[in-house]
Amino acid sequence: MEKMMPGMVKEEWPPSSPEEGEAPRPMEGLHEVGPPPFLTKTFDLVADPATDGVVSWGRAGSSFVVWDPHVFAAVFLPRFFKHNNFSSFVRQLNTYGFRKIDPDRWEFANDGFLRGQRHLLKMIKRRRPLSYLPGSQQALGTCLEVGQFGLDEEIDRLKRDKNILLAEVVKLRHKQQSTKANMRAMEERLQHAEQKQVQMMGFLARAMQNPDFFHQLIHQQDKMKGLEDTFSKKRTRSIDIVPFLNPGEVSQGDQLESTLLFDPRPFAELNDEPAKSELENLALNIQGLGKGKQDVNRTRNQPRNQASNETELTDDFWEELLNEGARDDAGIPGMERRRPRYVDALAQKLGYLSNSSQK
């Protein structure tokens, strides 16, 4: 340490410039916050010409496009971001305000992410989560939640309407099934009627080709009328002769009379089966008279409904009826063997030209 001589005064030179006398200041931009590393890495990755086949700038330079997401996730994400999840990269872009501008490809844009303008990256701010919102914004969110009560009522009303519509659909479906069942039953009845009509037309055609059939028919009707007269006389005679019985006793004649008096034909309309036409009844009566050469009493005691069920108007029935008529023709005197011309014309119109004897 230097000792000052007596009488000597230390002189201080003034600063050469006014800046040297001011307090020191930090370097310009020292406290400025730079862009996040995620944005800088993404900018460098997009701007690198070596990666244009995988990721590059858009045509206008205001967006970037990921052309191959698989290669981008497998090669570049582990190198720059230490992971290989492309969905995580997209979510990270969303947190910084990037938006997807093309639905057909992975093209993203941001107002601060432009080609050749790296300094604009500091303008891009990360979105804050909802937990960091100020009190006023949280209050606004609460108000919005309170306003959703009206939407809940609307949703409940729509659910009720949906349930009503579903019940209506189920009801209509049941009606549709019942309608289909009725239509199927109607189709079966129509087919049965058409089949019966075809059989009747065939019977008529074959009958018209046989000129002796009508003479046989008249002869059979006369037989039937005689049998009915005989049967009615016997019934009247049994009613006139009534034996004396004690109270509560029933004679065999009464039992037989009750069986004979009960005729189910007036109740045929109450059955589900369709009533037979006059021609069918006539054919059945002719067939019954042909077989009436057997025991008459056994036929009388047999129930009517059983006889009707056993006799069906099938093709075999008509064939047997005509063959039986042809056999009975030998015993009828004065029968013509010639076929009239109108019979042939009618048979040709009906389309059945084959004779029953040829079959």
Swiss-Prot record:
Q: Lineage of the source organism?
A: Eukaryota, Viridiplantae, Streptophyta, Embryophyta, Tracheophyta
Ranges annotated as biased composition (Basic and acidic residues):
1-13
Q: By its UniProt entry, which SMART domains does this protein fall under?
A: HSF
The entry's protein name is Heat stress transcription factor A-2d
The record's listing under Pfam families reads: HSF_DNA-bind
Q: How is it modified after translation?
A: Exhibits temperature-dependent phosphorylation.
Q: Please report, in chain numbering, the residue ranges of the motif AHA.
A: 315-324
Q: Which UniProt keywords apply?
A: Coiled coil, Cytoplasm, DNA-binding, Nucleus, Phosphoprotein, Stress response, Transcription, Transcription regulation
Q: What triggers expression?
A: By heat stress.
Which coarse location class describes where this protein primarily resides? cytoplasm
Q: In the record, what terms sit under GO molecular function?
A: DNA-binding transcription factor activity; sequence-specific DNA binding
Is-annotated flag, keyword Transcription regulation?
Answer: yes
Name the domain of life: Eukaryota
Instruction: From the UniProt record, list the coiled-coil ranges.
Output: 150-202
Where can this protein be found? Cytoplasm; Nucleus
Motif (Nuclear export signal) on chain? 279-286
Motif (Nuclear localization signal) spans which residues? 233-237
Region annotation (Hydrophobic repeat HR-A/B) ranges? 158-208
CC terms in the record's Gene Ontology section: cytoplasm; nucleus
- Family per record: Belongs to the HSF family. Class A subfamily.
Gene name per UniProt: HSFA2D
Q: What does this protein do?
A: Transcriptional regulator that specifically binds DNA of heat shock promoter elements (HSE).
Disordered: annotated segments: 1-30, 290-314
Q: Which InterPro entries match?
A: HSF_DNA-bd, WH-like_DNA-bd_sf, WH_DNA-bd_sf
Subunit structure and binding partners: Homotrimer.
